[in-house]
Amino acid sequence: LICSVYTPDGKPFAGDPRNVLRRMLDQAAAAGYRFMVAPELEFFLFKTDPNGNILEPHDKASYFDISTDLATHIRRQMARTLQAMGIAVEAVHHEVAPGQHEIDLRYADALQSADHLVTARVALKAVAQMNGLHATFMPKPIAGVNGSGMHVHQSLLDRDTGKNLFADPDDPYGLSALARHFIAGLLAHARGMCALLAPLVNSYKRLVPGFEAPVYISWGRTNRSALVRVPRITAGRYQATRIELRCPDPACNPYLAYTAMLAAGLDGIRRKLPLRDATEEDLFHVDPRARGLTTLPTSLGSALDALREDEVILEAIGPSIAERFLDARQQEWESYRAYVSQWEIERYLAIF
């Protein structure tokens, strides 16, 4: 059951993330926009023993492998399950890391997409369990391989006509001025909203160089090291124009994540923020200081500090959720900081 929460006097409950997203979507609608999104949901499948203990990745396959992909039938079962629940699936495939998979949900209104996403995470875990496996949306369960992200494709449509307002066939990137302001807003608030898009201590072990995850706050077309990517659109299909935000991970609350993205983009439109030049080279092999690039937060602690300083994002989620989210995440960060890991024991105990 998915619903919005109201107080006894009939007012939307301020602590309900679904109400927060609805409020932000109402603001967009008042400006003439409809916010559309499509998440790419990545996850790992692990083997389990008879007691349910998690063991190792289900297979040794990689991106779009066939012969070593042991979960083709499971992904098909997952897709059929979602579709039977009214959740449209765009694509399914094996991802880069062993045991890693991706299911892309079809473009939808942001509220419907968030509802589908929270449902899908539960459903996919259930299907995995029926096959004797454990599905995890932990961003980085295995060191040394790619982590699981949740890239979010997004665009604004005209509220009344459904026309894609991001499209401009005459622009070199196919982007309208509105889309450029929207991207500029995402870049301006990237640090401030990062804690909502990547909410775990573990999230920041995914956002490191070398594993196809964004680190630098930049945008480009074919550049998969950039934070925002503009997919190339076939001539004549301009209604499909969209941008892809690459830092979110599947552990996020989609209602809060979509709220933050939309708030950032609308702020860019409202202030007509200029969009810096695109970067198309691999940013992991350039001097970021020479390019004037800043980075995403490198830890949950620094992400929380950035959120505290971002008035636009704080206003979007509201003081009730902001206070509780910051308190809960800060407690997790402090617990992690105080924990002495096995890595530290093995590295330092004998030599100091």
Question: Model features per residue range: what roles?
Answer:
Residues 1-352:
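Glycine-rich, acidic/polar active-site loops that bind/position phosphate-bearing ligands
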